[in-house]
Regions:
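Long, low-complexity segments enriched in small/aliphatic residues
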Residues: 268-284
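Anion (oxyanion) recognition and catalysis
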Residues: 14, 64, 281
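General beta-strand structural signal in soluble alpha/beta enzymes
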Residues: 20-22, 53, 116, 166-168, ...
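C-terminal catalytic lobe of FAD-dependent flavoproteins
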Residues: 8, 102, 111, 125, ...
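Helical element adjacent to the flavin cofactor pocket in flavoenzyme catalytic cores
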Residues: 1-50, 58, 208
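Flavin-dependent oxidoreductases
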Residues: 29-142, 150-158, 240-255, 259-266, ...
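A short alpha-helix-loop-beta-strand transition element characteristic
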Residues: 69-72, 99, 221-225, 284
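Hydrophobic/aromatic-lined pockets within catalytic cores
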Residues: 14, 56, 67, 215-219, ...
Length: 285
C-alpha cells in the first residue's frame, strides 16, 4: 500500500524534526557563493547544505536547472484492474505477486480482483521527451490497449479467470526508465552536495532501500553495501539524448525477459568505441 507506507514515513520524519511542505512548487535550485543551495519555491526560498533530486518523472527537468543532463526517459505504462472475481474471493490468503516472462506481465491481487501490468515486448513508447508540463500532477494518459493485445492474450492463458473478467479500471501513465534499468542513487557529477535519487522503474520495492543507503552516503560518506551499480556517475554525456531513449525503450521491452549467455542487444551500439574499432570492424570482428 504505497499511500499508507508514504504517510507512515512522513510521520516518522516529522517526529525526527523534518519539515514537509505540501502543495509547494519548486521553481529553481541555485548554488550560492557560500557553497549552500538555494531552493526557490512559489512560497519562498529555502537555503540548505544538501539537495536531493527525487523528482520522479520531472527529475531530468529539475536536473537541467543545475546543468545536468540525466539519462532518464519516461515510458508509457499500463496496468489494468478487473472487477471482483469469485475465484479470488474464495481464496483464504493473498497469493504472491507473479512475474510472467512469457506474457511479460506482472499479476497481483487487488481486493477481490486481479491487477495485471504488461510490459509490451514491442511498440513501447517514450513520453514527454520535450518536457512535462509542471501542472501534470496525478494525471493519467488515455488508454492505448492495442499494443497490449499479445501480452493480455498470454495472460489469459496463464490465469483463465482473467479472460472472463470485466475491466474495472485502466491506469496509463509515465514511469521512469534508464538505459540499463538501474536507478540513479548517489552524488551528481561535479556538484557538491547535490544528490540523485531518481530514475527508478520499480518504485515501492526499491524505495525504502534507496532512502536508507542514500542517507548513509550523505551522513557518513559511504554505504554499508556496495551500490556501485546505481551510482549516477556510471553514465557520462554519451548516455543522454537519443542513446538514452533507444536503450530505455529496449530495457522496458526486455523488462521480464531472462538474460541468457551470449545475448547481444545491439540497441544503442556503437556509441563508445576504442581507436581500434574501425580497423577491427574491417577485419570482421
Amino acid at each position: 500500500d504505497p499511500a499508507s507506507a508514504t504517510s507512515s514515513m512522513a510521520i516518522g520524519a516529522r517526529m525526527g524534526g523534518a519539515e514537509i511542505y505540501r502543495h509547494t512548487q519548486v521553481l529553481d535550485t541555485r548554488l550560492k557563493d557560500t557553497g549552500e543551495w538555494a531552493v526557490v519555491t512559489d512560497k519562498g526560498t529555502i537555503t540548505c547544505e544538501h539537495v536531493v533530486n527525487a523528482a520522479g518523472s520531472f527529475a531530468r527537468q529539475v536536473g537541467e536547472w543545475v546543468g545536468l543532463d540525466l539519462p532518464i526517459v519516461n515510458m508509457k505504462h499500463h496496468y489494468l484492474v478487473t472487477e471482483n472475481l469469485p475465484e479470488m474471493a474464495a481464496l483464504d490468503k493473498e497469493p504472491p505477486v507473479i512475474r510472467d516472462p512469457r506474457a511479460s506481465c506482472y499479476y497481483r491481487q487487488e481486493q477481490d480482483g486481479i491487477l495485471i501490468g504488461p510490459y509490451e515486448k514491442s511498440g513501447a513508447e517514450a513520453w514527454g521527451l520535450d518536457g512535462i508540463d509542471w501542472g501534470f500532477d496525478m494525471e493519467l494518459l488515455n488508454p492505448e490497449l492495442e499494443r497490449l493485445e499479445t501480452s493480455l492474450e498470454l495472460a489469459a492463458e496463464r490465469i483463465p479467470c482473467w479472460s472472463e473478467a470485466g475491466i474495472k479500471r485502466v491506469v496509463h501513465g509515465p514511469i521512469t526508465h534508464t538505459p540499463d534499468g538501474g536507478f540513479l542513487l548517489g552524488p551528481a557529477e561535479a556538484l557538491s552536495n547535490y544528490w540523485l535519487c531518481c530514475g527508478a522503474s520499480i518504485g515501492i520495492t526499491q524505495g525504502p532501500g534507496c532512502g536508507k543507503y542514500l542517507a548513509q552516503w550523505m551522513v557518513h560518506g559511504q554505504t554499508e553495501i556496495n551500490v556501485r551499480d546505481m551510482d549516477p556517475r556510471r553514465y557520462g554525456k554519451w548516455a543522454c539524448g537519443d542513446y538514452a531513449v533507444a536503450k530505455s525503450i529496449d530495457e522496458y521491452q526486455e523488462m521480464y525477459q531472462p538474460v541468457l549467455p551470449g545475448d547481444f542487444r545491439d540497441t544503442g551500439r556503437p556509441t563508445r568505441v576504442t581507436p581500434l574499432y574501425d580497423r577491427l570492424k574491417e577485419l570482421g570482428a
